Structure formats: C-alpha cells, structure tokens
C-alpha cells in the first residue's frame, strides 16, 4: 500500500492517493460432462416376407393363428403334451406339417433333422 500527499498551490488542501495491491488467485473450475448413448426407438418392423394371416392388412410374426387348448384348472401350460411350433391346419400358407419320427425331409421343407423350425 502506498500513500502520497502534498500541498496544493491555491487552496491549501491536500489530496491523497491510496493504492492497494492484493494477490488474486484465478478460480479453477472444472466441468464434467457425462455423455450417454441415445436409446433407440423401440418399434416392430416387418420384412416383406412376413405373413398377413388374417387378411386384415396387418402383419404378424407367426404363420398361424395362436390357439390354446382349454385345460383343467390347475394344469400348467408346461404339462401340455401338444407343444408344437406350428399348426397342421389347411390355412397354414407356408405348408408346415407336423414332423413325424422317421419321415423323410424334402429340400423345400422348413424343418431341420431334429424337427424344429427354421426361419
């Protein structure tokens, strides 16, 4: 700190100047950004070979209508003996048939040798 004073020529008054020096430390601020991957919109998209099995202009991922056989109260769905991947009805436009043991497969068949579906 410095102070100066001195007489003036006309009025006899004095003036003073005060100088203050202070050390200012720069502020160190840090900013952290957390980037997150944008979640994709959840939507169903059908390919051109998806079947419209009800002829209503809608598409479905299954080739046949889903029918659940009525079962007695208390019987779980895992106890059912008819756990087929497709139906045998005439309206199945992909021609799926129930695989029988010992039957020969044709090259155009959708089944592999274990009898499971391939799509």
From Swiss-Prot:
Region of interest (Atypical RING finger domain 1), residue spans: 55-65
Xref: InterPro entries: PPI_Ypi1 (IPR011107)
Cellular component aspect of the GO annotation: nucleus
EC number: 2.3.2.27
Catalysed transformations (reactions): S-ubiquitinyl-[E2 ubiquitin-conjugating enzyme]-L-cysteine + [acceptor protein]-L-lysine = [E2 ubiquitin-conjugating enzyme]-L-cysteine + N(6)-ubiquitinyl-[acceptor protein]-L-lysine
A Pfam family of this chain: PPI_Ypi1
First and last residue of the signal peptide: none
GO MF assignments: protein phosphatase 1 binding; protein serine/threonine phosphatase inhibitor activity; ubiquitin protein ligase activity
Keyword Acetylation: no
Keywords assigned: Protein phosphatase inhibitor, Transferase, Ubl conjugation pathway
UniProt entry tagged with the keyword Iron: no
Enzyme class name: transferase
Annotated stretches, region: Disordered: 1-42, 96-119
Domain of life, per lineage: Eukaryota
Amino acid composition bias (Basic and acidic residues), ranges on this chain: 107-119
Name this polypeptide is given: E3 ubiquitin-protein ligase PPP1R11
Species whose genome carries this gene: Xenopus laevis
Source species taxonomy: Eukaryota, Metazoa, Chordata, Craniata, Vertebrata
UniProt gene name: ppp1r11
